[in-house]
Amino acid sequence: MPKANLDLLALNRGLVSPLALARVDVERTRLSAAEMTNWTAKTQGAMRLRTGDVYLGSSLSDAKAGWIPFVASTSDTALIELTDQKMRVWVNDALITRPSVSTTISNGSFATSAGWTDASTGGGVVTMSGQLILNGTNINGAAIVTRQITVAAPDQNIEHALNIIVAGGPVTFRVGSTSGGQEYIAETTLLTGNHSLAFTPTGDFHLTFRHGDIYPVYLSTIAVASAGVMEITTPWPLLDIPGIRSDQSADVVFVACGNALSSPVGSSFHTPRRIERRGTGRSWSVVLYQPDNGPFVPERTSKAKLKVSATFGNTTLTASENFFTSAHVGAIFRLFHTGQNGVFRFGSADAYSPAWEVNGIGAATERRSTIVTTGTWTANIRVQRSFDGPDEGFRTVQTITTNTTTNIDDADDNVTVWYRLAIPVTADYTSGTAIATLTYTGGGVTGICRVLAYNSATTVTVNVLKRFSLTEYTDNWNEGQWSDKRGHPTSAALFEGRLWWFGGSQAFGSVSDDYANYDDETEGESAPIVKTIGRGPVDSVYWALPLQRMLLGTAGQEIAMQSSSLDEPLTSQNTAARTISTQGSADVAAVVVDTRGIFVQRSGKRVFMLDFDLNQGTHQAQELSLLVPDLLDSGVVSLAVQRQPDTRFHCVLGDGRVAVLTFEKAEEVLCWAVVETDGFVEAAIVLPGTDEDQLYYHVRRVINGQTKRYLEKFSLERECHYPQTIYSGTSTSSITDLPYADGTAVTLRDASGVKLENQTVTGGTITLASPVTWAEITPSRSGLVDSAKHGTQSASATITGLSHLEGEAVVVWADGKSFSPIASGVQTTFTVSAGQITLPETVQEYSVGLGYSAPWQSTKMAYAAAAGTALNQIKRLDHIAFILYETHNGGLFYGRDYDHMDCLPQVRKGATVRGTEIFNTYDELSYEFPGSYDTDSRICLKAFAPHAATVMAAVPSLRTEDKI
């Protein structure tokens, strides 16, 4: 009858598949677990009861939500909540909420011009008739409206917010304490979309809207925000939110949404968006991302010819045959015409036309430019020439002062020069608007327009973004790559100074360091990059990871966007897309961990890591879920990565559980465990922190018969696991060198467990109301409860403010002790009624929430055999010893199964354990284990919130009866 003391010294090996339980020959299997729920593995080897979480609030209307972490720095973060076509923002764990003010803006829908002042300059035009239309009209013209808003004395020095809807931007906006000032909101550009802009006026404030380009922009409404939570309208319906992919640069989040089921193959109907933050973090916008200069399809997409009705402003784009559809609204078109003609309107000084390039031979032929001036005006229009380029070196060579036809004959044959028209200084302009029409047959002009409205299959209304040369048909045109007609990108990422968009098996990289520029006429290595990716069927790009190389995930393969050498930046000339894995990806956002990428395989039930292999010179796919093939059977619906205090991947499953992988490659830690709560986890989100990252779950719970969805934030480990301090010495009113953070509430009790008083730690010291010679000092509150409320109150047995847990059985830790002990397997709980519970004694500091248990079961204890293997042999575990750390005396139960369990012995070193005692360290001789003779002997452990438990090692004694 051989006997052995087994050593379970590493409890961070985690779950293993039932298919591997017979592999007792493998060391990893011996240290693994058949069940590991609500235990958190530490990279050092221990496991501890997972932390609980705090109730923060509900998502909008308790609806399912998507979440985008916003990280400006580790100390400047926010959570963006997306529900059905709505966005809210959580800052410092609270929703941005607008205060109540009586300030209003009458005629904020611009039904008439009442209340608004037209302050336009240089011929700018303002129109108000159900919306505000601003048009610069002339070169250097500016359409400007202003308004003074009265703020009553009680509303001064209280935050105001302006809700602004821009129907067609960009609009320049500022708010000041003086007319035209920007003391409250510095001048900013409002793109097409919805804005909520906050500021705090000390008195009346002044609004200024401005637009200086020669095409119209449209503002729908402006209003002072009503009291309540900030809500901003978005385009994303609930079903499409899981398809959102984003990346962030400073205060801007670039968003693609690729989950529209009716969109073109591999693409989306959702135009890319920008989520913008301004100022102190209380101003937010959701606006269109619409580059004005690309990307374009290389060849025209129809045999139709196109022409514009005017070369600038708001005009009509006409096709020679049926071509346009309503899905073209928002699309851009580029048309090329020979000749460099133009119509330039001048209505002020400091006005310069675009330059035109002159070359060829013959002053009166190839090198002749003709200017026809019309209108009512008094000014000096200077004809200027440059030999240096289109942007510098101009000198006046001729002056036009009246309506006439002027020929500019350049005699420098075969010399390239540039001309422009200008009214450069104030002295050159007196009044009126001069219209100068240029005709020059040399060269050519590429104009760009954006479709505003669909009229028919042959005409659409457009805004001219870049001037055209002629109003004649041309077959030299290109359609933009992105539109509702052609589809939009499905993923976005920032990499090597470029903003990348992916969709429809194509990759689009912006001009370097210019995220809204896709001008394919840009020269050199900074030029934009447009590449076809993948092979075989057209695939959606489900995710993009900027690692050493840009990695992409599609349904059929994983792809690396790479240059000709590892450290060479991507350019339009050296970029290639190469397959690095054929696992295929699920439509789940992947995550980055240092230089590695973590993604969900095509089945949705396996998790892989892409790690760079120096020997292969590329990334290799390695399965992380290999040892637990059944764990993810319900499907992974989202991923989040936590880096501190350990690296953990939170894989939210389709059954409401979370599979958590603790990972540390250098220490060969790969530990799967499960998190369960009394609810259904729908999302996990991580924001960076200093000592520990901030982890959030969005949990669906049924409370009092109603479905609720709560945002809950996990407590820090130091708020859940902590030492208990014993003071023993001379009578004192000041106890120093306490191991608790500043602000920690602690409770002092005597040796009988009677409460003495509560105090708050400052600089490791507490000052007592009454001196003591002996005291047990314990943090008053505990983070080991779910959906918790932590609070402070005057001494009372009643705890209120628990309406979010109405009808639920809750557990309580208050004034440094548990009110929810476990006896005979049953835990003491309290049922919330009318939002409150009543305890058997008064308390001041409390933590109340849902309880949870943490079962752990070993693999087969098939060891200590003298005649070969111990598998299928009768054996019995009869003793066990533990090494514990910061564990409550009632915090750990052990047994052969979950129905036969003992608590830790309540006598230690010959003394009875205090009922409130926490074992800071625990290293005792073995004691009896309630085992039985069986061929399959196991160890089962179980911990119960709110009792701390950290297991560093277990040493069971096993007796085996060999049968030969």
Where in the sequence are the language-model features?
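Extracellular and organelle-lumenal recognition/adhesion modules and their flexible linkers in secreted
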Residues: 99-227, 352-369, 377-382, 387-392, ...
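Autoprocessing Asn-cyclization modules and mimics
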Residues: 96-110, 121-140, 153-155, 228-231, ...
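Beta-sandwich interaction modules
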Residues: 192-200, 235-245, 359-362, 395-440, ...
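N-terminal beta-propeller domains
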Residues: 1-100, 269-312, 339-342, 455-457, ...
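Elongated alpha-helical scaffolds
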Residues: 65, 82-85, 231-273, 552-553
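Short Trp-Ser/Thr-centered turn/loop motifs at beta-strand boundaries
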Residues: 146-147, 185, 341-363, 386, ...
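Edge beta-strands of jelly-roll/beta-sandwich modules across compartments, strongly enriched
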Residues: 215-222, 427-442, 947-961
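Beta-sheet repeat architectures centered on beta-propellers
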Residues: 2-99, 237-240, 536-539, 582-585, ...
